[in-house]
Structures are given as structure tokens and as C-alpha cells.
Amino acid sequence: MSYAISPAEQSSVAIEGSEDRFPVRRIYCVGRNYRAHAIEMGADPDRDPPFFFMKPADAIVENGATIPYPSQTSNLHHEIELVVAIDKGGKDISLEDALNHV
């Protein structure tokens, strides 16, 4: 296949204790899931439920790398995310069986 421009490299993250990397295709996020931070940002966790959104896979910044942001930024809020790698799909997975899919 021929592309008009070169496609981006596959986004990936390091795997602790391995030389392999894990490919990242999608990043699903949960907002307002940390109560203290939600309050700090002016939300009421008892009234405002968590919400879901996505980020592009190339939004990943590796450990120790520089976070790119506009030079005129005066109030930068960064977040550290927990990554769960789903190994196999499923539907209506029981709580007891959930970790068998990670």
C-alpha cells in the first residue's frame, strides 16, 4: 500500500521486567474518579459522577521524558495514569474471572 505521508509509528509502552513493549491502540480514560482531585478542581463527587473519554495513543509520554506543552502555559495539571493491558476480550465477564483477561 502506498501512503501520501508516512504513517506514525506504533505507540507502545515498556513492560516492567521485560525487553518487550506493549502496543497501545486505544486509551480509555475515566475522569473524576479520584475524589480528592475532583474536589480540588471544583467538582462535587457526590453530585457529579465519573465520566469517560478517550485520548490518542500517541499522547503517551514515557517515564522520564519531557511533557510537551505551550511555553506560555502558567498552570499545567499533569496526571499519571494506571495502565491495564487487556490480553483477551470478553463480554459480561464475572468478577472472579476478570483477572484472567488482564
Residue ranges of each PLM-predicted region?
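Catalytic-core "active-site belt" of small-molecule-metabolizing enzymes
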Residues: 1-102
